[in-house]
A protein has these predicted regions:
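Two-metal-ion acidic nuclease core segments, chiefly of the RNase H-like superfamily
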Residues: 192-209
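A short, amphipathic alpha-helix used for macromolecular contacts
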Residues: 1-34
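Extended hydrophobic secondary-structure segments that form protein cores and membrane-embedded regions
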Residues: 21-22, 88, 174-181, 209-214, ...
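C-terminal accessory extensions appended to soluble enzyme cores
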Residues: 167, 236-299
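Electropositive, glycine- and tryptophan-enriched low-complexity nucleic-acid-binding patches
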Residues: 112-178, 183
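RNase H-like two-metal-ion nuclease catalytic core shared by retroviral integrases
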Residues: 187, 209-231
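Short, conserved catalytic/metal-binding motifs centered on acidic residues
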Residues: 1, 27, 39, 90, ...
Length: 299
Protein backbone atom coordinates (compact mmCIF):
# COMPACT_ATOMS: atom_id res chain seq x y z
CA UNK A 1 0.00 0.00 0.00
CA UNK A 2 2.87 2.37 0.81
CA UNK A 3 4.31 1.87 -2.68
CA UNK A 4 0.86 2.22 -4.26
CA UNK A 5 0.14 5.61 -2.73
CA UNK A 6 3.67 6.97 -3.08
CA UNK A 7 3.01 8.52 -6.51
CA UNK A 8 -0.40 9.82 -5.43
CA UNK A 9 0.77 11.47 -2.21
CA UNK A 10 0.89 15.25 -1.90
CA UNK A 11 1.73 17.70 0.84
CA UNK A 12 4.82 19.21 2.39
CA UNK A 13 7.79 16.91 1.60
CA UNK A 14 9.62 18.16 4.70
CA UNK A 15 6.57 18.40 6.94
CA UNK A 16 4.28 15.92 8.64
CA UNK A 17 1.10 16.75 6.69
CA UNK A 18 0.51 14.58 3.64
CA UNK A 19 -2.57 13.56 1.68
CA UNK A 20 -3.61 11.02 -0.96
CA UNK A 21 -5.07 12.40 -4.19
CA UNK A 22 -6.89 9.21 -5.25
CA UNK A 23 -10.23 7.93 -3.95
CA UNK A 24 -10.56 4.63 -2.07
CA UNK A 25 -12.25 2.90 -5.01
CA UNK A 26 -9.55 4.11 -7.42
CA UNK A 27 -6.84 2.74 -5.15
CA UNK A 28 -8.74 -0.54 -4.74
CA UNK A 29 -8.94 -0.85 -8.54
CA UNK A 30 -5.16 -0.84 -8.73
CA UNK A 31 -4.88 -3.91 -6.50
CA UNK A 32 -6.47 -7.25 -7.34
CA UNK A 33 -8.96 -8.78 -4.88
CA UNK A 34 -8.90 -5.81 -2.49
CA UNK A 35 -12.04 -3.85 -1.64
CA UNK A 36 -12.23 -0.15 -0.90
CA UNK A 37 -13.03 -0.96 2.75
CA UNK A 38 -9.72 -2.81 3.01
CA UNK A 39 -7.95 0.18 1.46
CA UNK A 40 -9.58 2.42 4.08
CA UNK A 41 -8.33 0.17 6.88
CA UNK A 42 -4.79 0.09 5.47
CA UNK A 43 -4.71 3.87 5.06
CA UNK A 44 -5.75 4.30 8.70
CA UNK A 45 -2.91 1.99 9.74
CA UNK A 46 -0.53 4.29 7.83
CA UNK A 47 -1.86 7.32 9.71
CA UNK A 48 -4.24 8.68 7.05
CA UNK A 49 -7.85 9.70 7.74
CA UNK A 50 -10.55 11.91 6.21
CA UNK A 51 -9.98 15.52 7.25
CA UNK A 52 -11.53 18.84 6.31
CA UNK A 53 -9.91 22.25 5.89
CA UNK A 54 -9.52 24.16 9.14
CA UNK A 55 -9.98 27.95 9.21
CA UNK A 56 -7.21 28.80 11.65
CA UNK A 57 -4.70 31.07 9.93
CA UNK A 58 -5.35 34.80 10.27
CA UNK A 59 -2.18 36.21 8.79
CA UNK A 60 0.84 37.49 10.68
CA UNK A 61 -0.04 38.94 14.10
CA UNK A 62 0.11 42.68 14.55
CA UNK A 63 3.21 43.73 16.56
CA UNK A 64 0.95 45.45 19.11
CA UNK A 65 -1.40 42.46 19.49
CA UNK A 66 -0.30 41.37 22.98
CA UNK A 67 0.05 44.96 24.16
CA UNK A 68 -3.54 45.67 23.13
CA UNK A 69 -4.91 42.55 24.80
CA UNK A 70 -3.18 43.48 28.06
CA UNK A 71 -4.64 46.99 27.81
CA UNK A 72 -8.15 45.61 27.23
CA UNK A 73 -7.81 43.30 30.24
CA UNK A 74 -6.71 46.18 32.46
CA UNK A 75 -9.62 48.35 31.32
CA UNK A 76 -12.14 45.57 31.80
CA UNK A 77 -10.92 44.84 35.33
CA UNK A 78 -10.98 48.57 36.11
CA UNK A 79 -14.60 49.01 35.01
CA UNK A 80 -15.90 45.81 36.60
CA UNK A 81 -14.17 46.51 39.91
CA UNK A 82 -15.76 49.98 39.98
CA UNK A 83 -19.20 48.55 39.20
CA UNK A 84 -19.39 50.40 35.89
CA UNK A 85 -21.03 48.80 32.82
CA UNK A 86 -18.74 46.91 30.46
CA UNK A 87 -20.07 45.23 27.33
CA UNK A 88 -18.87 43.20 24.38
CA UNK A 89 -20.81 43.79 21.17
CA UNK A 90 -20.83 42.84 17.51
CA UNK A 91 -23.09 41.87 14.62
CA UNK A 92 -23.78 38.20 13.91
CA UNK A 93 -23.66 37.03 10.31
CA UNK A 94 -26.94 37.82 8.56
CA UNK A 95 -29.59 35.13 8.14
CA UNK A 96 -32.04 34.52 5.29
CA UNK A 97 -35.56 34.42 6.71
CA UNK A 98 -37.67 31.77 5.03
CA UNK A 99 -37.83 28.03 4.47
CA UNK A 100 -34.06 27.54 4.37
CA UNK A 101 -31.75 24.97 5.91
CA UNK A 102 -30.25 25.96 9.25
CA UNK A 103 -27.06 24.08 10.11
CA UNK A 104 -27.19 21.66 12.99
CA UNK A 105 -29.66 19.03 14.16
CA UNK A 106 -32.37 18.64 16.78
CA UNK A 107 -34.47 15.85 18.27
CA UNK A 108 -37.70 15.37 16.31
CA UNK A 109 -39.81 12.60 14.82
CA UNK A 110 -38.88 13.66 11.30
CA UNK A 111 -36.72 16.28 9.65
CA UNK A 112 -38.12 19.48 8.16
CA UNK A 113 -38.24 19.80 4.38
CA UNK A 114 -36.59 23.04 3.28
CA UNK A 115 -35.67 24.73 0.03
CA UNK A 116 -32.98 23.00 -1.99
CA UNK A 117 -31.28 26.32 -2.76
CA UNK A 118 -30.66 29.45 -0.69
CA UNK A 119 -31.87 32.04 -3.19
CA UNK A 120 -32.25 35.55 -1.81
CA UNK A 121 -35.35 35.99 -3.98
CA UNK A 122 -37.10 33.22 -2.01
CA UNK A 123 -36.48 34.91 1.35
CA UNK A 124 -38.85 37.20 3.22
CA UNK A 125 -35.84 39.32 4.14
CA UNK A 126 -32.27 39.15 5.36
CA UNK A 127 -31.94 39.72 9.11
CA UNK A 128 -28.86 40.90 10.99
CA UNK A 129 -28.61 40.32 14.72
CA UNK A 130 -26.50 42.83 16.64
CA UNK A 131 -25.67 41.47 20.06
CA UNK A 132 -24.69 43.26 23.27
CA UNK A 133 -23.32 41.13 26.10
CA UNK A 134 -23.00 42.51 29.64
CA UNK A 135 -19.67 41.21 30.96
CA UNK A 136 -20.74 41.53 34.61
CA UNK A 137 -24.38 40.40 34.56
CA UNK A 138 -24.28 37.44 32.13
CA UNK A 139 -27.11 39.08 30.22
CA UNK A 140 -27.43 39.75 26.52
CA UNK A 141 -29.65 41.80 24.26
CA UNK A 142 -30.02 41.28 20.52
CA UNK A 143 -31.36 43.91 18.14
CA UNK A 144 -32.56 42.24 14.93
CA UNK A 145 -32.43 44.57 11.94
CA UNK A 146 -33.70 44.03 8.41
CA UNK A 147 -31.68 46.68 6.57
CA UNK A 148 -28.00 47.64 6.39
CA UNK A 149 -25.45 46.71 9.04
CA UNK A 150 -24.16 50.26 9.47
CA UNK A 151 -22.54 52.31 12.20
CA UNK A 152 -25.95 53.81 12.97
CA UNK A 153 -27.45 50.35 13.41
CA UNK A 154 -24.58 49.25 15.67
CA UNK A 155 -24.79 52.26 17.97
CA UNK A 156 -28.59 52.22 18.05
CA UNK A 157 -28.43 48.59 19.19
CA UNK A 158 -26.21 49.67 22.09
CA UNK A 159 -28.59 52.58 22.77
CA UNK A 160 -31.54 50.18 23.01
CA UNK A 161 -29.57 47.95 25.37
CA UNK A 162 -28.68 50.91 27.60
CA UNK A 163 -32.29 52.08 27.80
CA UNK A 164 -33.27 48.61 28.97
CA UNK A 165 -30.38 48.00 31.34
CA UNK A 166 -29.42 51.44 32.69
CA UNK A 167 -31.61 50.85 35.76
CA UNK A 168 -29.08 48.20 36.80
CA UNK A 169 -26.39 50.90 36.84
CA UNK A 170 -28.11 53.91 38.46
CA UNK A 171 -24.83 55.68 39.31
CA UNK A 172 -22.94 54.94 36.09
CA UNK A 173 -21.12 57.80 34.41
CA UNK A 174 -19.07 55.77 31.98
CA UNK A 175 -19.35 52.74 29.71
CA UNK A 176 -16.74 50.34 28.30
CA UNK A 177 -17.40 48.83 24.87
CA UNK A 178 -15.27 45.93 23.58
CA UNK A 179 -15.61 45.35 19.83
CA UNK A 180 -13.57 43.82 17.04
CA UNK A 181 -11.47 45.84 14.63
CA UNK A 182 -13.59 45.61 11.48
CA UNK A 183 -17.11 45.92 10.17
CA UNK A 184 -19.58 48.66 10.98
CA UNK A 185 -18.14 49.01 14.50
CA UNK A 186 -14.51 48.85 13.43
CA UNK A 187 -11.79 51.31 14.42
CA UNK A 188 -11.77 52.97 10.98
CA UNK A 189 -15.45 53.90 10.21
CA UNK A 190 -16.21 57.53 10.99
CA UNK A 191 -19.96 56.94 11.21
CA UNK A 192 -19.48 54.62 14.18
CA UNK A 193 -17.61 57.33 16.09
CA UNK A 194 -20.09 60.06 15.17
CA UNK A 195 -23.00 57.97 16.40
CA UNK A 196 -21.15 57.15 19.61
CA UNK A 197 -20.76 60.88 20.20
CA UNK A 198 -24.53 61.27 19.88
CA UNK A 199 -25.08 58.40 22.30
CA UNK A 200 -22.63 59.94 24.78
CA UNK A 201 -24.46 63.28 24.56
CA UNK A 202 -27.87 61.65 25.08
CA UNK A 203 -26.85 59.43 27.98
CA UNK A 204 -24.29 61.71 29.62
CA UNK A 205 -21.82 58.80 29.58
CA UNK A 206 -18.09 58.77 28.92
CA UNK A 207 -17.83 55.96 26.39
CA UNK A 208 -14.51 54.11 26.22
CA UNK A 209 -14.00 51.84 23.22
CA UNK A 210 -11.39 49.09 22.91
CA UNK A 211 -11.00 47.27 19.59
CA UNK A 212 -9.55 43.79 19.24
CA UNK A 213 -6.38 43.68 17.13
CA UNK A 214 -6.45 42.33 13.59
CA UNK A 215 -7.33 38.66 13.25
CA UNK A 216 -8.59 38.36 16.83
CA UNK A 217 -12.34 38.93 16.49
CA UNK A 218 -13.06 35.31 17.48
CA UNK A 219 -11.76 36.16 20.94
CA UNK A 220 -14.49 38.75 21.48
CA UNK A 221 -16.67 37.72 24.43
CA UNK A 222 -19.94 38.26 22.57
CA UNK A 223 -18.97 35.53 20.09
CA UNK A 224 -18.58 32.82 22.73
CA UNK A 225 -20.92 33.94 25.50
CA UNK A 226 -23.89 35.13 23.43
CA UNK A 227 -23.75 34.14 19.76
CA UNK A 228 -22.46 30.64 20.52
CA UNK A 229 -25.41 29.70 22.77
CA UNK A 230 -27.84 31.32 20.30
CA UNK A 231 -26.48 29.23 17.42
CA UNK A 232 -26.78 26.09 19.55
CA UNK A 233 -30.37 26.93 20.51
CA UNK A 234 -31.62 27.39 16.95
CA UNK A 235 -29.44 24.67 15.38
CA UNK A 236 -31.42 22.64 12.85
CA UNK A 237 -34.45 24.91 13.13
CA UNK A 238 -35.40 26.74 9.91
CA UNK A 239 -35.85 30.46 10.58
CA UNK A 240 -39.11 30.67 8.65
CA UNK A 241 -40.14 34.02 10.09
CA UNK A 242 -38.70 36.89 12.09
CA UNK A 243 -40.85 35.81 15.03
CA UNK A 244 -39.28 32.34 14.95
CA UNK A 245 -35.84 33.95 14.98
CA UNK A 246 -36.71 36.28 17.85
CA UNK A 247 -38.24 33.47 19.93
CA UNK A 248 -35.16 31.29 19.39
CA UNK A 249 -32.94 34.14 20.60
CA UNK A 250 -35.14 34.89 23.62
CA UNK A 251 -35.21 31.22 24.59
CA UNK A 252 -31.43 30.96 24.72
CA UNK A 253 -29.76 30.10 28.01
CA UNK A 254 -26.86 28.00 29.29
CA UNK A 255 -25.37 26.50 32.45
CA UNK A 256 -23.98 29.91 33.43
CA UNK A 257 -27.50 31.33 33.70
CA UNK A 258 -27.41 33.43 30.54
CA UNK A 259 -30.53 35.51 29.95
CA UNK A 260 -31.24 37.04 26.54
CA UNK A 261 -33.76 39.62 25.35
CA UNK A 262 -34.42 40.50 21.73
CA UNK A 263 -36.43 42.94 19.68
CA UNK A 264 -37.10 43.70 16.03
CA UNK A 265 -35.70 46.87 14.47
CA UNK A 266 -37.48 47.76 11.22
CA UNK A 267 -35.77 51.12 10.76
CA UNK A 268 -34.22 51.55 7.31
CA UNK A 269 -30.58 52.45 7.87
CA UNK A 270 -28.96 54.38 5.05
CA UNK A 271 -25.72 52.94 3.74
CA UNK A 272 -22.62 54.74 2.48
CA UNK A 273 -23.09 57.80 4.71
CA UNK A 274 -20.04 60.06 4.55
CA UNK A 275 -18.84 61.86 7.67
CA UNK A 276 -16.87 64.99 6.78
CA UNK A 277 -13.61 66.22 8.28
CA UNK A 278 -15.36 69.17 10.00
CA UNK A 279 -17.79 66.72 11.64
CA UNK A 280 -14.90 64.61 12.90
CA UNK A 281 -13.21 67.67 14.39
CA UNK A 282 -16.34 68.35 16.45
CA UNK A 283 -16.10 64.99 18.21
CA UNK A 284 -14.93 65.14 21.81
CA UNK A 285 -12.55 62.20 21.51
CA UNK A 286 -9.40 61.47 23.49
CA UNK A 287 -6.89 58.67 23.00
CA UNK A 288 -4.41 57.01 25.37
CA UNK A 289 -0.75 56.48 24.55
CA UNK A 290 -1.31 52.73 24.33
CA UNK A 291 -2.43 51.74 20.81
CA UNK A 292 -4.31 55.04 20.24
CA UNK A 293 -5.84 53.85 16.94
CA UNK A 294 -7.60 50.98 18.78
CA UNK A 295 -8.53 52.78 22.00
CA UNK A 296 -10.40 56.04 22.57
CA UNK A 297 -12.92 57.74 24.84
CA UNK A 298 -15.83 59.84 23.60
CA UNK A 299 -17.60 62.18 26.03
Amino acid sequence: MTELIAEATGGDPEGRRKYVRLSLRTLAGKVKSVSHTTVRRLLKQLGYSLRANVKRLSGPPHPDRDRQFRYIQRKQREFLKAGDPAISSDAKSSELIGNFKNDGSLWCDRGDEVNAYDFRSDAQCRATAYGVYDLAKCRGHVNVGTSGNTGEFSVHSIRVWWKKESRRYPHARRLLIKVDGGGSNGWRPRLWKRELQRLADESDLRITVCHDPRGASKWNDVEHRLFGPISINWAGQPLRSLEVMLNAIRGTTNASGLKVTAQLDRHRYTTKIKVSDPEMKELNITRPKTCPHWNYTIA
